[in-house]
Amino acid sequence: MDPKSQRVKLNDGHFIPVLGFGTYAPEEVPKSEALEATKFAIEVGFRHVDSAHLYQNEEQVGQAIRSKIADGTVKREDIFYTSKLWCNSLQPELVRPALEKSLQNLQLDYVDLYIIHSPVSLKPGNKFVPKDESGKLIFDSVDLCHTWEALEKCKDAGLTKSIGVSNFNHKQLEKILNKPGLKYKPVCNQVECHPYLNQSKLLEFCKSHDIVLVAYAALGAQLLSEWVNSNNPVLLEDPVLCAIAKKHKQTPALVALRYQVQRGVVVLAKSFNKKRIKENMQVFDFELTPEDMKAIDGLNRNIRYYDFQKGIGHPEYPFSEEY
């Protein structure tokens, strides 16, 4: 199966590859690793690269993409690149400058997809995570519909081909969809999604509105990040997942990725380990049976690794809703 043809049509007519390469790494990981890993990912066949202003590696990721264009491995139009608008720039007048900053770091003319990283707006300024003396996040108050209108203008200006959201619940999506004078629907909602949090209701909602669900933390999460709730079980050690993997002579990670592909979810695979980057491309080489899919569906326990507890109390905190 040719991974290049593994694409899903977005509601604006553009196509997104169903397997994406995630570039987030904890701060202690040298940024040069993002450069090498992204280059290698493109070499082994990844055509969808996901990053964000928050990750502070767009310079390296852009360099990787440009070097693979320069050496003839790919053309710019072969690559689907996603960037994200961070929470401190949700005020409408800050949206375009934030995207232009990302483009400047990337040294690219446009991104393929620009998404609102989270609905929780934070105080504008040069701090990613503005906190008061007691260590509490300093919230901002923004109408997400106004933020959305600013994204629509970025699309019209050709700075991004498509626009979407991330970490939105269905009510927040509805708010955008029902906005008077809506010009473009969100093409996607990128959320945490894996067998322990399979997002079946949100997936159904998104499908009914022709919005693609993009899965991050598809393999669970490294329990070291400050954003992660570390009391959770390790997904890839799940006995059901391991048994299905053994049956197919695949790894539990590949089974977790394949599960999403078969549900019509676009899935991000995040690893800077060359062996695993290459291995993740094998997601197209096997198929899970309906019984396998049902068994994995049965693992759902609404466990959220990235629960962003510091955002609780914000009027737009997304995870108080069931979906």
Curated annotation (Swiss-Prot):
The active site is at Y55. PROSITE patterns: ALDOKETO_REDUCTASE_1 (PS00798), ALDOKETO_REDUCTASE_2 (PS00062), ALDOKETO_REDUCTASE_3 (PS00063). Substrate binds at H117. Its main location: cytoplasm. Pathway: Lipid metabolism; prostaglandin biosynthesis. CDD domains: AKR_AKR1C1-35. InterPro entries: AKR (IPR020471), AKR1C (IPR044482), Aldo/ket_reductase_CS (IPR018170), NADP_OxRdtase_dom (IPR023210), NADP_OxRdtase_dom_sf (IPR036812). GO terms for cellular component: cytosol. Monomer. Belongs to the aldo/keto reductase family. PANTHER family: ALDO/KETO REDUCTASE. This is Prostaglandin F synthase 1. It comes from Bos taurus.
